[in-house]
């Protein structure tokens, strides 16, 4: 069981981040058999300084039979910047996509909110059941959709990347992430193991996803300024997007 009573920086973060963090943890606990995932020493909770402001990074990490690693990262820079980052890394024994979402918020509001179920199979497509369910979801209008980065071909056609401009759009985003989460958790429970040959192919897909995500220069620059290049490289490669064995 998750220790939800434990103090968390999400209680001081932007309301959308706080609501989404609670939602993610509640779905994990509802559907999955969670065991703690051991992060490298000193990287579970981190404090530093960036441009005179205190930077706090708080990680929640678990694993299950279906997921080799489930990572929720919350970060807060003074009173100026709040971040949520979440990825569910599948156990390559199962034909599951990658769930991922990120939110970046400041006093001015949410500047970026992205969520996706990203393919890991050799065809670069989601399983048929995922496609059917996601295609049937109600269409929502967002006033400011954002462009994916150059390496964004790892994402699916259902990827949602926006700058929500009001509380209604924030609620629509939260609703869509919840739909992604419920579908993904339910499908993971009925997923059938792959053959050894198939496992190698899905492992390659996950490897590609992590390798492309490691190219996110914005994340690297922030971490390097606060903790140095060596630490940033270690954190990105061992915590954020560790490559599967």
From Swiss-Prot:
EC number per UniProt: 1.3.7.5
GO molecular function: cobalt ion binding; phycocyanobilin:ferredoxin oxidoreductase activity
Family, similarity comment: Belongs to the HY2 family.
Protein name per UniProt: Phycocyanobilin:ferredoxin oxidoreductase
Function: Catalyzes the four-electron reduction of biliverdin IX-alpha (2-electron reduction at both the A and D rings); the reaction proceeds via an isolatable 2-electron intermediate, 181,182-dihydrobiliverdin.
Keywords for this protein: Oxidoreductase
Protein's organism: Gloeothece citriformis (strain PCC 7424)
Keyword Oxidoreductase: yes
Domain of life: Bacteria
Organism lineage string: Bacteria, Bacillati, Cyanobacteriota, Cyanophyceae, Oscillatoriophycideae
Membrane-crossing segments per the record: none
EC top class named in words: oxidoreductase
InterPro entries: Ferredoxin-dep_bilin_Rdtase, Ferredoxin_bilin_OxRdtase
Catalytically driven reaction(s): (2R,3Z)-phycocyanobilin + 4 oxidized [2Fe-2S]-[ferredoxin] = biliverdin IXalpha + 4 reduced [2Fe-2S]-[ferredoxin] + 4 H(+)
GO biological process annotation, one example: phytochromobilin biosynthetic process
């Amino acid at each position: 069981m998750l220790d939800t009573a434990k103090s968390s920086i999400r209680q001081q973060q932007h309301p959308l981040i706080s609501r989404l963090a609670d939602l993610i943890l509640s779905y994990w606990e509802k559907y999955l058999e969670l065991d703690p995932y051991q992060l490298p020493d000193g990287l579970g909770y981190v404090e530093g300084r960036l441009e005179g402001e205190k930077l706090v990074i708080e990680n929640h990490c678990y694993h299950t039979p279906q997921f080799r690693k489930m990572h929720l990262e919350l970060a807060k820079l003074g009173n100026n910047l709040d971040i949520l980052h979440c990825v569910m890394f599948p156990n390559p024994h199962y034909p599951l996509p990658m769930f991922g979402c990120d939110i970046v918020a400041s006093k001015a509001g949410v500047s970026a909110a992205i969520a996706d179920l990203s393919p890991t199979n050799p065809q670069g497509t989601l399983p048929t059941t995922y496609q059917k369910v996601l295609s049937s979801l109600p269409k929502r209008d967002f006033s400011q959709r954002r462009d994916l980065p150059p390496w964004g071909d790892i994402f699916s056609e259902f990827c949602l990347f926006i700058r929500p401009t009001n509380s209604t759009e924030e609620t629509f985003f939260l609703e869509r992430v919840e739909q992604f989460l419920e579908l993904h958790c339910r499908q993971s429970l009925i997923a059938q193991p792959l053959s050894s040959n198939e496992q190698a192919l899905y492992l390659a897909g996950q490897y590609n996803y992590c390798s492309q995500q490691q190219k996110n220069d914005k994340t690297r620059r922030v971490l390097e300024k606060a903790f140095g290049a060596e630490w940033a490289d270690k954190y990105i490669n061992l915590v954020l997007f560790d490559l599967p064995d």
